[in-house]
Curated annotation (Swiss-Prot):
Molecular function per GO: FAD binding; oxidoreductase activity
Residues annotated as signal peptide: 1-27
Assigned keywords, A-Z: FAD, Flavoprotein, Glycoprotein, Oxidoreductase, Signal
Protein name: FAD-linked oxidoreductase sor8
Name of the gene this protein is made from: sor8
High-level lineage: Eukaryota, Fungi, Dikarya, Ascomycota, Pezizomycotina
Disruption phenotype: Leads to the accumulation of dihydrosorbicillinol as well as to higher amounts of oxosorbicillinol.
Protein backbone atom coordinates (compact mmCIF):
# COMPACT_ATOMS: atom_id res chain seq x y z
CA UNK A 1 0.00 0.00 0.00
CA UNK A 2 1.41 3.36 -0.96
CA UNK A 3 0.58 5.02 2.34
CA UNK A 4 0.31 8.77 2.86
CA UNK A 5 2.92 10.38 5.11
CA UNK A 6 0.49 10.75 7.99
CA UNK A 7 -0.79 7.19 7.63
CA UNK A 8 2.20 5.00 6.96
CA UNK A 9 1.97 3.07 10.22
CA UNK A 10 -1.59 2.52 9.36
CA UNK A 11 -0.96 0.90 1.83
CA UNK A 12 -8.67 0.50 10.93
CA UNK A 13 -20.59 -3.29 20.54
CA UNK A 14 -23.34 -4.56 18.93
CA UNK A 15 -23.08 -5.75 15.35
CA UNK A 16 -25.84 -3.47 14.12
CA UNK A 17 -23.97 -0.34 15.26
CA UNK A 18 -22.10 -0.10 11.96
CA UNK A 19 -24.24 1.65 9.34
CA UNK A 20 -24.74 -0.37 6.18
CA UNK A 21 -22.42 1.82 4.12
CA UNK A 22 -20.69 -1.04 2.34
CA UNK A 23 -23.33 -1.85 -0.25
CA UNK A 24 -26.14 -0.11 -2.09
CA UNK A 25 -28.27 -3.20 -1.54
CA UNK A 26 -31.19 -2.79 0.83
CA UNK A 27 -32.56 -5.36 3.24
CA UNK A 28 -35.47 -5.92 0.85
CA UNK A 29 -33.13 -6.94 -1.95
CA UNK A 30 -31.43 -9.67 0.06
CA UNK A 31 -32.58 -13.21 -0.52
CA UNK A 32 -32.59 -13.98 3.18
CA UNK A 33 -31.77 -12.50 6.54
CA UNK A 34 -31.80 -15.85 8.29
CA UNK A 35 -29.86 -19.07 8.06
CA UNK A 36 -30.92 -19.89 4.49
CA UNK A 37 -28.23 -21.16 2.15
CA UNK A 38 -28.56 -17.79 0.40
CA UNK A 39 -26.71 -16.37 3.39
CA UNK A 40 -23.45 -17.50 4.90
CA UNK A 41 -23.97 -19.38 8.13
CA UNK A 42 -23.75 -17.10 11.16
CA UNK A 43 -23.04 -17.64 14.87
CA UNK A 44 -26.28 -18.68 16.55
CA UNK A 45 -27.73 -20.27 13.42
CA UNK A 46 -28.62 -23.95 13.50
CA UNK A 47 -26.10 -24.51 10.71
CA UNK A 48 -23.20 -23.03 12.69
CA UNK A 49 -20.50 -25.68 13.28
CA UNK A 50 -20.72 -27.45 16.62
CA UNK A 51 -17.83 -27.47 19.11
CA UNK A 52 -17.10 -30.99 17.91
CA UNK A 53 -16.95 -29.74 14.31
CA UNK A 54 -14.48 -27.03 15.24
CA UNK A 55 -12.38 -29.48 17.26
CA UNK A 56 -12.20 -31.92 14.37
CA UNK A 57 -11.32 -29.16 11.93
CA UNK A 58 -8.61 -27.87 14.27
CA UNK A 59 -7.09 -31.34 14.39
CA UNK A 60 -7.16 -31.55 10.60
CA UNK A 61 -5.02 -28.39 10.33
CA UNK A 62 -2.54 -29.49 12.97
CA UNK A 63 -3.95 -27.39 15.80
CA UNK A 64 -3.53 -24.15 13.88
CA UNK A 65 -7.09 -22.87 14.39
CA UNK A 66 -7.23 -19.68 16.48
CA UNK A 67 -10.41 -18.62 18.28
CA UNK A 68 -10.56 -14.83 18.21
CA UNK A 69 -9.87 -13.01 21.46
CA UNK A 70 -9.95 -9.29 20.58
CA UNK A 71 -6.93 -7.24 21.61
CA UNK A 72 -9.26 -4.97 23.57
CA UNK A 73 -10.56 -7.77 25.80
CA UNK A 74 -8.20 -6.71 28.60
CA UNK A 75 -10.20 -3.47 28.82
CA UNK A 76 -13.59 -5.07 29.53
CA UNK A 77 -15.53 -7.40 31.80
CA UNK A 78 -13.96 -10.17 33.82
CA UNK A 79 -10.77 -10.05 31.76
CA UNK A 80 -10.15 -6.38 32.64
CA UNK A 81 -6.55 -5.60 33.56
CA UNK A 82 -5.85 -1.92 34.12
CA UNK A 83 -2.15 -2.06 33.31
CA UNK A 84 -2.56 -4.22 30.21
CA UNK A 85 -5.48 -2.09 29.03
CA UNK A 86 -3.31 1.03 29.32
CA UNK A 87 -0.62 -0.74 27.31
CA UNK A 88 -3.10 -1.70 24.57
CA UNK A 89 -4.39 1.86 24.30
CA UNK A 90 -0.86 3.24 24.10
CA UNK A 91 0.10 0.71 21.43
CA UNK A 92 -3.12 1.04 19.42
CA UNK A 93 -1.80 3.63 16.93
CA UNK A 94 1.16 1.44 15.94
CA UNK A 95 0.79 -0.86 12.96
CA UNK A 96 2.67 -3.73 14.61
CA UNK A 97 -0.04 -3.92 17.27
CA UNK A 98 -2.47 -5.10 14.61
CA UNK A 99 -0.37 -6.72 11.89
CA UNK A 100 0.72 -9.55 14.17
CA UNK A 101 -2.87 -10.29 15.22
CA UNK A 102 -4.99 -12.98 13.55
CA UNK A 103 -8.11 -10.82 13.87
CA UNK A 104 -7.38 -7.12 14.33
CA UNK A 105 -7.61 -4.56 11.53
CA UNK A 106 -5.95 -1.22 10.99
CA UNK A 107 -9.01 0.58 9.62
CA UNK A 108 -10.96 1.09 12.86
CA UNK A 109 -14.22 1.86 11.06
CA UNK A 110 -14.55 -1.83 10.20
CA UNK A 111 -13.79 -3.00 13.72
CA UNK A 112 -17.16 -1.35 14.44
CA UNK A 113 -16.29 -0.71 18.09
CA UNK A 114 -16.09 -4.47 18.63
CA UNK A 115 -14.45 -4.94 22.03
CA UNK A 116 -13.05 -1.43 21.62
CA UNK A 117 -10.38 -0.61 24.22
CA UNK A 118 -11.53 3.02 24.24
CA UNK A 119 -15.11 2.21 25.29
CA UNK A 120 -16.01 2.08 29.01
CA UNK A 121 -14.94 -0.99 30.98
CA UNK A 122 -18.54 -2.07 31.51
CA UNK A 123 -19.22 -2.22 27.76
CA UNK A 124 -19.48 -5.91 26.81
CA UNK A 125 -16.58 -7.33 24.83
CA UNK A 126 -18.03 -8.94 21.71
CA UNK A 127 -16.23 -10.36 18.69
CA UNK A 128 -18.58 -8.39 16.48
CA UNK A 129 -17.15 -7.73 13.04
CA UNK A 130 -13.88 -9.52 13.72
CA UNK A 131 -13.51 -13.02 12.26
CA UNK A 132 -14.71 -15.72 14.68
CA UNK A 133 -11.77 -17.98 13.94
CA UNK A 134 -8.61 -17.92 11.84
CA UNK A 135 -6.28 -20.62 10.59
CA UNK A 136 -2.60 -19.79 11.01
CA UNK A 137 -1.65 -21.01 7.53
CA UNK A 138 1.64 -22.88 7.24
CA UNK A 139 1.09 -24.88 4.05
CA UNK A 140 -0.97 -25.31 0.92
CA UNK A 141 -2.77 -28.14 2.70
CA UNK A 142 -3.95 -25.72 5.41
CA UNK A 143 -5.48 -23.53 2.72
CA UNK A 144 -7.14 -26.45 0.98
CA UNK A 145 -8.63 -27.85 4.18
CA UNK A 146 -9.92 -24.43 5.25
CA UNK A 147 -11.52 -23.84 1.87
CA UNK A 148 -13.20 -27.24 2.02
CA UNK A 149 -14.48 -26.75 5.58
CA UNK A 150 -15.78 -23.24 4.92
CA UNK A 151 -17.73 -24.42 1.88
CA UNK A 152 -19.06 -27.58 3.53
CA UNK A 153 -20.35 -25.49 6.44
CA UNK A 154 -21.34 -22.49 4.26
CA UNK A 155 -19.12 -20.10 6.22
CA UNK A 156 -17.96 -16.65 5.27
CA UNK A 157 -14.30 -16.88 4.28
CA UNK A 158 -11.84 -14.03 4.85
CA UNK A 159 -8.34 -14.00 3.36
CA UNK A 160 -6.12 -11.84 5.58
CA UNK A 161 -2.49 -11.09 6.28
CA UNK A 162 -1.61 -7.85 8.07
CA UNK A 163 -4.99 -6.11 8.22
CA UNK A 164 -3.70 -3.20 6.13
CA UNK A 165 -6.83 -2.30 4.21
CA UNK A 166 -9.11 0.73 3.87
CA UNK A 167 -12.16 -1.36 2.88
CA UNK A 168 -12.57 -3.89 5.68
CA UNK A 169 -11.66 -6.80 3.40
CA UNK A 170 -9.47 -8.31 6.13
CA UNK A 171 -12.36 -9.03 8.45
CA UNK A 172 -15.97 -10.12 8.44
CA UNK A 173 -18.64 -10.91 11.03
CA UNK A 174 -19.04 -14.64 11.50
CA UNK A 175 -16.01 -15.23 9.31
CA UNK A 176 -13.34 -17.90 9.16
CA UNK A 177 -10.01 -16.32 8.34
CA UNK A 178 -7.17 -17.69 6.25
CA UNK A 179 -4.33 -15.93 8.10
CA UNK A 180 -1.40 -15.85 5.67
CA UNK A 181 0.89 -13.78 7.88
CA UNK A 182 3.42 -16.45 8.80
CA UNK A 183 4.22 -17.65 5.28
CA UNK A 184 7.67 -16.04 5.43
CA UNK A 185 9.71 -17.91 2.81
CA UNK A 186 12.05 -15.68 0.78
CA UNK A 187 14.18 -17.18 -1.99
CA UNK A 188 16.45 -15.06 -4.21
CA UNK A 189 17.35 -16.88 -7.42
CA UNK A 190 18.10 -16.56 -11.12
CA UNK A 191 15.08 -16.57 -13.41
CA UNK A 192 14.68 -17.06 -17.12
CA UNK A 193 11.56 -16.80 -19.26
CA UNK A 194 10.47 -15.32 -22.57
CA UNK A 195 9.53 -12.11 -20.77
CA UNK A 196 12.39 -11.72 -18.30
CA UNK A 197 15.86 -13.01 -17.53
CA UNK A 198 17.59 -11.91 -14.35
CA UNK A 199 17.42 -11.98 -10.57
CA UNK A 200 14.08 -12.75 -8.98
CA UNK A 201 12.56 -13.39 -5.56
CA UNK A 202 9.92 -15.95 -4.67
CA UNK A 203 8.31 -14.78 -1.45
CA UNK A 204 5.61 -16.20 0.78
CA UNK A 205 2.35 -14.32 1.17
CA UNK A 206 3.29 -13.26 4.69
CA UNK A 207 6.37 -11.27 3.67
CA UNK A 208 6.05 -7.57 4.49
CA UNK A 209 7.66 -4.69 2.63
CA UNK A 210 10.23 -3.94 5.32
CA UNK A 211 11.31 -7.57 5.57
CA UNK A 212 11.67 -7.82 1.81
CA UNK A 213 13.62 -4.58 1.52
CA UNK A 214 16.10 -5.45 4.27
CA UNK A 215 16.76 -8.98 3.00
CA UNK A 216 17.13 -7.93 -0.63
CA UNK A 217 19.41 -5.01 0.28
CA UNK A 218 21.90 -7.35 1.92
CA UNK A 219 22.15 -9.18 -1.40
CA UNK A 220 22.62 -5.96 -3.39
CA UNK A 221 19.03 -5.93 -4.63
CA UNK A 222 15.92 -3.78 -4.56
CA UNK A 223 12.32 -5.04 -4.68
CA UNK A 224 9.49 -2.77 -5.78
CA UNK A 225 7.10 -2.08 -2.90
CA UNK A 226 5.14 0.65 -1.20
CA UNK A 227 6.50 2.90 1.51
CA UNK A 228 4.91 1.37 4.59
CA UNK A 229 7.19 -1.42 5.90
CA UNK A 230 4.39 -3.45 7.49
CA UNK A 231 2.30 -3.96 4.34
CA UNK A 232 2.18 -7.50 2.95
CA UNK A 233 3.47 -7.53 -0.62
CA UNK A 234 1.77 -10.54 -2.21
CA UNK A 235 -1.75 -9.56 -1.17
CA UNK A 236 -3.83 -6.51 -1.96
CA UNK A 237 -0.80 -4.28 -2.52
CA UNK A 238 0.52 -6.09 -5.59
CA UNK A 239 -2.77 -7.66 -6.65
CA UNK A 240 -4.33 -4.19 -6.55
CA UNK A 241 -1.68 -2.50 -8.69
CA UNK A 242 1.10 -1.54 -6.32
CA UNK A 243 1.95 2.17 -6.39
CA UNK A 244 5.19 3.04 -4.65
CA UNK A 245 8.28 5.23 -4.53
CA UNK A 246 9.95 3.23 -7.33
CA UNK A 247 6.98 3.31 -9.71
CA UNK A 248 8.50 5.83 -12.12
CA UNK A 249 11.78 3.90 -12.25
CA UNK A 250 10.57 0.29 -12.51
CA UNK A 251 6.80 0.35 -12.89
CA UNK A 252 4.03 -0.77 -10.58
CA UNK A 253 4.33 -3.62 -8.12
CA UNK A 254 1.99 -5.60 -10.36
CA UNK A 255 4.33 -5.11 -13.31
CA UNK A 256 7.08 -7.01 -11.48
CA UNK A 257 5.16 -10.27 -11.10
CA UNK A 258 6.59 -13.26 -12.95
CA UNK A 259 4.54 -16.00 -11.29
CA UNK A 260 1.62 -16.39 -8.92
CA UNK A 261 1.32 -19.52 -6.80
CA UNK A 262 -2.23 -19.96 -5.56
CA UNK A 263 -5.08 -22.22 -4.50
CA UNK A 264 -8.46 -21.96 -6.21
CA UNK A 265 -11.79 -22.05 -4.41
CA UNK A 266 -12.19 -25.71 -5.40
CA UNK A 267 -8.90 -26.55 -3.67
CA UNK A 268 -6.78 -26.93 -6.80
CA UNK A 269 -3.20 -25.71 -6.54
CA UNK A 270 -2.25 -23.58 -9.53
CA UNK A 271 0.65 -21.56 -10.94
CA UNK A 272 -0.17 -18.60 -13.14
CA UNK A 273 2.33 -16.88 -15.44
CA UNK A 274 2.04 -14.78 -18.59
CA UNK A 275 2.13 -18.02 -20.61
CA UNK A 276 0.57 -20.58 -18.25
CA UNK A 277 -2.96 -20.03 -16.94
CA UNK A 278 -2.47 -16.57 -18.41
CA UNK A 279 -6.07 -15.47 -17.85
CA UNK A 280 -5.71 -16.03 -14.09
CA UNK A 281 -2.31 -14.31 -14.17
CA UNK A 282 -3.96 -11.33 -15.87
CA UNK A 283 -6.76 -11.14 -13.27
CA UNK A 284 -4.50 -11.53 -10.22
CA UNK A 285 -2.10 -8.91 -11.53
CA UNK A 286 -4.04 -5.74 -10.82
CA UNK A 287 -7.62 -6.97 -10.52
CA UNK A 288 -7.74 -6.78 -6.74
CA UNK A 289 -6.79 -9.05 -3.85
CA UNK A 290 -8.85 -11.79 -2.23
CA UNK A 291 -11.03 -12.22 -5.30
CA UNK A 292 -10.01 -15.01 -7.67
CA UNK A 293 -7.79 -17.35 -5.63
CA UNK A 294 -5.72 -17.56 -2.45
CA UNK A 295 -2.16 -16.50 -3.29
CA UNK A 296 0.37 -18.25 -1.07
CA UNK A 297 3.50 -16.97 -2.84
CA UNK A 298 4.64 -14.91 -5.79
CA UNK A 299 7.79 -14.52 -7.86
CA UNK A 300 8.85 -10.99 -8.78
CA UNK A 301 11.72 -9.21 -10.50
CA UNK A 302 14.67 -8.10 -8.39
CA UNK A 303 16.65 -5.02 -9.42
CA UNK A 304 20.26 -4.14 -8.62
CA UNK A 305 20.77 -1.49 -5.96
CA UNK A 306 21.53 1.91 -7.45
CA UNK A 307 22.24 5.45 -6.35
CA UNK A 308 19.11 7.12 -4.98
CA UNK A 309 18.51 10.65 -3.73
CA UNK A 310 15.87 11.50 -1.18
CA UNK A 311 14.39 14.82 -0.11
CA UNK A 312 11.91 16.34 2.33
CA UNK A 313 10.29 19.78 2.57
CA UNK A 314 7.99 21.16 5.25
CA UNK A 315 6.55 24.55 6.01
CA UNK A 316 3.75 25.80 8.27
CA UNK A 317 0.67 27.87 7.65
CA UNK A 318 1.86 30.47 10.11
CA UNK A 319 0.21 33.61 8.78
CA UNK A 320 -1.97 34.43 5.83
CA UNK A 321 -3.77 31.43 4.37
CA UNK A 322 -3.51 33.01 0.93
CA UNK A 323 0.27 33.19 1.29
CA UNK A 324 0.46 29.59 2.55
CA UNK A 325 -1.43 28.24 -0.45
CA UNK A 326 0.79 30.23 -2.79
CA UNK A 327 3.59 28.17 -1.29
CA UNK A 328 1.62 24.97 -1.85
CA UNK A 329 1.09 26.00 -5.47
CA UNK A 330 4.83 26.55 -5.88
CA UNK A 331 5.37 22.93 -4.89
CA UNK A 332 2.56 21.76 -7.18
CA UNK A 333 4.37 23.47 -10.05
CA UNK A 334 7.43 21.19 -9.77
CA UNK A 335 5.58 17.87 -9.49
CA UNK A 336 5.80 17.17 -13.25
CA UNK A 337 9.54 17.88 -13.14
CA UNK A 338 10.05 15.32 -10.37
CA UNK A 339 8.34 12.68 -12.49
CA UNK A 340 10.20 13.70 -15.65
CA UNK A 341 13.49 13.23 -13.79
CA UNK A 342 12.50 9.67 -12.87
CA UNK A 343 11.31 10.37 -9.35
CA UNK A 344 8.23 10.16 -7.17
CA UNK A 345 6.92 12.33 -4.37
CA UNK A 346 4.51 11.99 -1.47
CA UNK A 347 3.06 15.02 0.28
CA UNK A 348 0.24 16.03 2.59
CA UNK A 349 -1.61 19.33 2.84
CA UNK A 350 -3.33 20.14 6.12
CA UNK A 351 -4.83 23.39 7.31
CA UNK A 352 -1.68 24.15 9.30
CA UNK A 353 1.19 22.79 7.19
CA UNK A 354 2.53 21.22 4.03
CA UNK A 355 4.69 18.13 4.50
CA UNK A 356 6.54 16.83 1.44
CA UNK A 357 8.41 13.57 1.69
CA UNK A 358 9.77 11.27 0.91
CA UNK A 359 10.69 12.51 -2.53
CA UNK A 360 12.55 9.61 -4.13
CA UNK A 361 14.97 9.96 -7.03
CA UNK A 362 16.40 6.63 -8.23
CA UNK A 363 19.56 7.10 -10.28
CA UNK A 364 19.32 10.84 -9.52
CA UNK A 365 22.04 13.05 -8.06
CA UNK A 366 21.57 15.39 -5.14
CA UNK A 367 22.40 18.28 -7.46
CA UNK A 368 19.55 17.34 -9.77
CA UNK A 369 17.10 17.05 -6.87
CA UNK A 370 18.16 20.42 -5.48
CA UNK A 371 17.81 22.08 -8.88
CA UNK A 372 14.23 20.77 -9.18
CA UNK A 373 13.36 22.23 -5.77
CA UNK A 374 15.15 25.55 -6.32
CA UNK A 375 12.10 27.39 -7.75
CA UNK A 376 10.01 26.33 -4.75
CA UNK A 377 12.56 27.49 -2.23
CA UNK A 378 12.99 30.79 -4.03
CA UNK A 379 9.23 31.32 -3.98
CA UNK A 380 9.02 30.48 -0.28
CA UNK A 381 11.81 32.97 0.43
CA UNK A 382 9.95 35.62 -1.55
CA UNK A 383 6.77 34.88 0.41
CA UNK A 384 8.72 35.08 3.69
CA UNK A 385 7.66 31.53 4.59
CA UNK A 386 9.95 29.68 6.97
CA UNK A 387 10.67 26.18 5.71
CA UNK A 388 12.85 23.13 6.27
CA UNK A 389 14.38 21.43 3.24
CA UNK A 390 16.77 18.50 3.21
CA UNK A 391 18.20 16.25 0.52
CA UNK A 392 20.74 13.48 0.45
CA UNK A 393 22.35 11.05 -1.97
CA UNK A 394 22.73 7.38 -1.06
CA UNK A 395 24.07 4.22 -2.66
CA UNK A 396 20.66 2.50 -2.60
CA UNK A 397 16.93 3.09 -2.35
CA UNK A 398 16.90 1.18 0.93
CA UNK A 399 19.25 3.69 2.57
CA UNK A 400 17.50 6.70 1.04
CA UNK A 401 14.11 5.50 2.22
CA UNK A 402 15.42 4.83 5.72
CA UNK A 403 16.72 8.40 5.93
CA UNK A 404 13.79 10.24 4.37
CA UNK A 405 10.79 8.13 5.35
CA UNK A 406 10.80 7.95 9.16
CA UNK A 407 7.98 5.90 10.73
CA UNK A 408 4.79 7.78 11.51
CA UNK A 409 2.33 6.79 14.19
CA UNK A 410 -1.26 6.59 12.98
CA UNK A 411 -3.64 3.72 12.46
CA UNK A 412 -6.73 5.77 11.79
CA UNK A 413 -7.76 7.55 8.65
CA UNK A 414 -10.94 7.46 6.65
CA UNK A 415 -10.21 8.14 3.01
CA UNK A 416 -11.39 8.76 -0.50
CA UNK A 417 -9.30 9.11 -3.62
CA UNK A 418 -8.89 10.29 -7.19
CA UNK A 419 -6.38 9.78 -9.98
CA UNK A 420 -5.36 12.94 -11.82
CA UNK A 421 -3.76 13.15 -15.24
CA UNK A 422 -0.98 15.65 -15.94
CA UNK A 423 -3.08 17.71 -18.36
CA UNK A 424 -5.92 18.05 -15.84
CA UNK A 425 -3.54 19.01 -13.03
CA UNK A 426 -1.44 21.54 -14.92
CA UNK A 427 -4.43 22.90 -16.84
CA UNK A 428 -6.38 23.97 -13.76
CA UNK A 429 -3.92 24.82 -10.98
CA UNK A 430 -6.26 27.20 -9.16
CA UNK A 431 -9.11 24.70 -9.24
CA UNK A 432 -7.03 22.08 -7.41
CA UNK A 433 -5.70 24.58 -4.89
CA UNK A 434 -9.22 25.79 -4.08
CA UNK A 435 -10.55 22.24 -3.72
CA UNK A 436 -7.66 21.23 -1.45
CA UNK A 437 -8.02 24.41 0.57
CA UNK A 438 -11.72 23.76 1.07
CA UNK A 439 -11.05 20.23 2.31
CA UNK A 440 -8.31 21.40 4.69
CA UNK A 441 -10.53 24.17 6.06
CA UNK A 442 -13.07 21.51 7.09
CA UNK A 443 -10.53 19.44 9.00
CA UNK A 444 -9.51 17.11 6.21
CA UNK A 445 -6.12 16.42 4.71
CA UNK A 446 -5.08 15.75 1.14
CA UNK A 447 -2.17 13.47 0.36
CA UNK A 448 -0.70 13.14 -3.09
CA UNK A 449 1.55 10.48 -4.58
CA UNK A 450 3.13 11.51 -7.87
CA UNK A 451 4.67 9.17 -10.43
CA UNK A 452 4.95 8.60 -14.17
CA UNK A 453 4.55 5.29 -15.99
CA UNK A 454 6.46 5.26 -19.25
CA UNK A 455 5.48 2.99 -22.11
CA UNK A 456 9.14 1.98 -22.26
CA UNK A 457 8.70 0.01 -19.02
CA UNK A 458 7.96 -3.44 -20.41
CA UNK A 459 5.64 -5.86 -18.63
CA UNK A 460 3.25 -8.67 -19.61
CA UNK A 461 -0.41 -7.71 -20.07
CA UNK A 462 -2.21 -7.33 -16.76
CA UNK A 463 -5.49 -6.01 -15.36
CA UNK A 464 -4.27 -2.79 -13.72
CA UNK A 465 -6.82 -0.05 -14.35
CA UNK A 466 -5.55 1.76 -17.48
CA UNK A 467 -6.40 5.08 -15.81
CA UNK A 468 -3.74 4.40 -13.17
CA UNK A 469 -1.14 4.19 -15.93
CA UNK A 470 -2.25 7.46 -17.51
CA UNK A 471 -2.15 9.54 -14.32
CA UNK A 472 0.41 11.83 -12.73
CA UNK A 473 -1.00 11.83 -9.19
CA UNK A 474 -3.01 9.58 -6.95
CA UNK A 475 -4.75 11.83 -4.42
CA UNK A 476 -6.03 10.50 -1.11
CA UNK A 477 -8.44 12.63 0.86
CA UNK A 478 -8.55 11.79 4.54
CA UNK A 479 -9.99 12.64 7.91
CA UNK A 480 -8.16 11.42 11.03
CA UNK A 481 -9.94 8.83 13.12
CA UNK A 482 -10.99 9.81 16.65
CA UNK A 483 -10.91 6.78 18.94
CA UNK A 484 -13.29 8.30 21.47
CA UNK A 485 -15.92 9.95 19.24
CA UNK A 486 -17.82 7.47 17.05
CA UNK A 487 -20.51 9.99 16.08
CA UNK A 488 -17.91 12.39 14.70
CA UNK A 489 -16.21 9.55 12.84
CA UNK A 490 -19.51 8.68 11.13
CA UNK A 491 -20.02 12.34 10.25
CA UNK A 492 -16.51 12.53 8.80
CA UNK A 493 -17.16 9.49 6.61
CA UNK A 494 -20.18 11.32 5.21
CA UNK A 495 -17.96 14.34 4.54
CA UNK A 496 -15.57 12.20 2.51
CA UNK A 497 -18.29 10.57 0.42
CA UNK A 498 -20.60 13.52 -0.05
CA UNK A 499 -18.27 16.53 -0.03
CA UNK A 500 -14.52 15.93 -0.19
CA UNK A 501 -14.30 13.34 -2.98
CA UNK A 502 -16.89 15.17 -5.12
CA UNK A 503 -14.82 18.36 -4.79
CA UNK A 504 -11.93 16.69 -6.62
CA UNK A 505 -14.13 14.65 -8.93
CA UNK A 506 -15.74 17.86 -10.19
CA UNK A 507 -12.37 18.91 -11.61
CA UNK A 508 -12.00 15.76 -13.72
CA UNK A 509 -13.63 14.54 -16.93
CA UNK A 510 -16.54 12.21 -16.10
CA UNK A 511 -15.64 12.42 -12.40
CA UNK A 512 -12.34 10.57 -12.74
CA UNK A 513 -11.02 7.25 -11.44
CA UNK A 514 -9.32 6.10 -8.25
CA UNK A 515 -6.52 3.75 -7.20
CA UNK A 516 -8.47 0.77 -5.90
CA UNK A 517 -6.27 0.31 -2.82
CA UNK A 518 -6.81 3.85 -1.55
CA UNK A 519 -10.31 5.12 -2.10
CA UNK A 520 -13.74 5.54 -0.52
CA UNK A 521 -15.39 2.18 0.19
CA UNK A 522 -18.73 3.90 -0.46
CA UNK A 523 -17.65 5.14 -3.90
CA UNK A 524 -20.69 5.28 -6.22
CA UNK A 525 -20.04 3.37 -9.42
CA UNK A 526 -16.91 1.81 -7.97
CA UNK A 527 -16.77 -0.81 -10.73
CA UNK A 528 -15.85 1.84 -13.29
CA UNK A 529 -13.97 4.13 -10.91
CA UNK A 530 -11.66 1.39 -9.55
CA UNK A 531 -11.38 -1.08 -12.45
CA UNK A 532 -12.24 0.94 -15.55
CA UNK A 533 -12.60 -0.84 -18.85
CA UNK A 534 -11.32 -4.12 -17.37
CA UNK A 535 -14.31 -4.75 -15.11
CA UNK A 536 -16.44 -6.90 -17.40
CA UNK A 537 -13.55 -9.20 -18.31
CA UNK A 538 -12.57 -9.47 -14.65
CA UNK A 539 -16.14 -10.40 -13.76
CA UNK A 540 -16.11 -13.14 -16.39
CA UNK A 541 -12.90 -14.53 -14.90
CA UNK A 542 -14.37 -14.31 -11.40
CA UNK A 543 -17.14 -16.61 -12.62
CA UNK A 544 -14.60 -19.00 -14.13
CA UNK A 545 -12.36 -19.32 -11.09
CA UNK A 546 -14.80 -18.64 -8.24
CA UNK A 547 -18.28 -19.43 -9.59
CA UNK A 548 -19.84 -19.80 -6.12
CA UNK A 549 -18.54 -16.53 -4.70
CA UNK A 550 -16.36 -18.10 -2.02
CA UNK A 551 -14.11 -15.00 -1.97
CA UNK A 552 -15.82 -11.72 -1.07
CA UNK A 553 -14.74 -8.26 0.00
CA UNK A 554 -16.18 -4.78 -0.32
CA UNK A 555 -15.67 -3.41 -3.85
CA UNK A 556 -13.96 -6.57 -5.08
CA UNK A 557 -15.01 -7.81 -8.51
CA UNK A 558 -18.42 -9.49 -8.23
CA UNK A 559 -19.02 -8.23 -4.70
CA UNK A 560 -22.23 -6.49 -5.79
CA UNK A 561 -23.87 -9.93 -5.87
CA UNK A 562 -23.64 -10.10 -2.09
CA UNK A 563 -24.36 -7.66 0.74
CA UNK A 564 -24.28 -7.49 4.50
CA UNK A 565 -27.58 -7.38 6.37
CA UNK A 566 -28.15 -5.13 9.36
CA UNK A 567 -26.61 -7.72 11.66
CA UNK A 568 -23.63 -8.05 9.25
CA UNK A 569 -24.30 -11.56 7.98
CA UNK A 570 -23.35 -11.96 4.31
CA UNK A 571 -26.22 -12.78 1.92
CA UNK A 572 -26.78 -13.02 -1.80
CA UNK A 573 -28.57 -10.11 -3.45
CA UNK A 574 -31.66 -11.03 -5.46
Amino acid sequence: MYAPPFVRAFGIAVLAVLPSFSSPATAASLKSSGSSSSCRCFPGDACWPSPADWKAFNQSVGGRLIATVPLGSVCHGTTYDAARCADVKAAWPYADTHTDSSSSVLAPFFANQSCDPFLPRETPCVIGTYVQYAVNVSSVADIQKTLAFSQKKNLRLVVRNTGHDYFGKSTGAGGLGLWMHNLKTYDIHDYKSAAYTGKAVTMGAGIQAGESAATAFKQGLTIVSGICPTVGLAGGYTQGGGLGPLTTRYGLGADQVLEWHAVLANGSEITATPTKNSDLYWALTGGGGGTYAVVYSMTVKAHANEKTTGANLTFPNAGSEDVFFQGVQAFHDIIPAISDAGGTAVWTVLSKALSVGPVTGPNMTKATMDSIFQPVLQKLDALNITYSYSSGEFSSFYESNAAYDPPVVSNGLQIGGRLVKRSDFTGNPDGFIQAIRGIADQGGLVTGASYQLSSSLQHPPNSVNPELRKSLISFQIGVPWINTDWATDLHNQDLITNSFVPALAALLPSGGSAYLNQADFREPGWQQVFYGENYEKLLELKDVYDPNGVFWGRTTVGSERWAETEDKRLCRVS
